[in-house]
Curated annotation (Swiss-Prot):
HAMAP family on file: THF_DHG_CYH
GO terms classed as biological process: L-histidine biosynthetic process; methionine biosynthetic process; purine nucleotide biosynthetic process; tetrahydrofolate interconversion
Database matches in Pfam families: THF_DHG_CYH, THF_DHG_CYH_C
Keyword Oxidoreductase belongs to the record: yes
Protein name, entry field: Bifunctional protein FolD 2
Keywords associated with the record: Amino-acid biosynthesis, Histidine biosynthesis, Hydrolase, Methionine biosynthesis, Multifunctional enzyme, NADP, One-carbon metabolism, Oxidoreductase, Purine biosynthesis
InterPro entries from the UniProt entry: Aminoacid_DH-like_N_sf, NAD(P)-bd_dom_sf, THF_DH/CycHdrlase, THF_DH/CycHdrlase_cat_dom, THF_DH/CycHdrlase_CS, THF_DH/CycHdrlase_NAD-bd_dom
Similarity field: Belongs to the tetrahydrofolate dehydrogenase/cyclohydrolase family.
Protein task: Catalyzes the oxidation of 5,10-methylenetetrahydrofolate to 5,10-methenyltetrahydrofolate and then the hydrolysis of 5,10-methenyltetrahydrofolate to 10-formyltetrahydrofolate.
Length: 299
């Protein structure tokens, strides 16, 4: 029987751990974890995401601060706000919602966030710590961190002897995911658009992670029987069966056919997606614990 992972359930258990660690930190040290979210402009999708993040931060018991800046905010004004948040001892996590309006350069802003407050895990210092296997010192990008919770709950902490294939080499997901699997002792192949005979490479995987943004690219005959398949893709495709002009969300994996072969699989939606915000909260309490000199919780 194939196990279909319920991402909402796993995310809820992560949030429970965050809540108890947050109240323990506050009762033992008087420190309340603080998350600042910065949004520039009025992109509706970004505002939806930010509201969800702020709401979840409050639910976790954090000090939740939202800075909404007008579309015409200058690079200097945004940089000044980040500098202010860097210097604020009540803020342990800083998140700048991307994408920024076209006239702003996101990279200098992201790299100006203190690495220890970079709860999105996008600072080069955090990327470097992950690449060198320093998982105790850095903060890991939220989506790969969330996918890794699924892997650990399936196989445990030590992946010795297991082959993992990550399709996708983006800085946001593919590279950090490969690094996390490697740090857990898996034998890792990072595949991408230039990989020769991708299906054959995938068939060797005990853990197959797809993150390329190509709807239902991974077919059943790419999957080793009994393997774990983690689908990170999120693609909107036409759904004429739902009526004219209707669409639906699908992943990078042809779910129905792959679910017949895989041992464990994540659906889209409802798989990796809910984990992203949960791991943002996890990173915030980890950052707060470290700054207070306490041992952070494990996820």
């Amino acid at each position: 029987m194939t196990t279909v992972i319920d991402g909402k359930n796993v995310a809820a258990s992560v949030i429970e751990t965050v809540k108890s660690a947050t109240s323990a930190l506050e009762s033992e040290t008087g420190v309340r974890a603080g998350l600042a979210v910065v949004i520039v402009g009025d992109d509706p999708a970004s505002h939806t995401y930010v509201s969800a993040k702020s709401r979840m931060a409050k639910e976790c018991g954090f000090l939740s601060v939202q800075h909404t800046l007008p579309e015409e905010t200058s690079q200097e004004e945004l940089a000044a706000l980040v500098a202010e948040l860097n210097a604020d001892p009540s803020i342990h996590g800083i998140l700048v919602q991307l994408p920024l309006p076209k006239h702003l350069r996101s990279e200098p802003i992201i790299q100006s966030i203190l690495p220890e407050k970079d709860v999105d895990g996008l600072h080069v210092v955090n990327a470097g710590k992950l690449a060198t296997g320093d998982l105790e010192g850095g903060l890991v990008s939220c989506t790969p961190a969330g996918a890794m919770v699924f892997v650990r709950r399936t196989y445990g902490d030590d992946l010795s002897g297991l082959n993992a294939v990550v399709i996708g080499r983006s800085n946001l997901f593919g590279k950090p995911m490969s690094a996390l699997l490697l740090a857990a002792n898996a034998t890792v192949t990072t595949a991408h658009s230039r990989t020769k005979d991708l299906a054959a490479v995938c068939r060797n995987a005990d853990i197959l992670v797809a993150a390329v943004g190509r709807p239902e690219m991974v077919k059943a005959d790419w999957v080793k029987p009994g393997a774990m398949v983690v689908d990170v893709g999120i693609n909107r495709v036409p759904a004429p069966e739902r009526g004219e002009g209707r669409t639906k969300l699908v992943g990078d994996v042809a779910f129905d056919e792959c679910a017949k072969v895989a041992g464990v699989i994540t659906p889209v939606p409802g798989g990796v997606g809910p984990m992203t915000i949960a791991m943002l909260m996890a990173n915030t309490i980890i950052a707060a614990c470290r700054m207070a000199g306490r041992k952070p919780p494990k996820f």
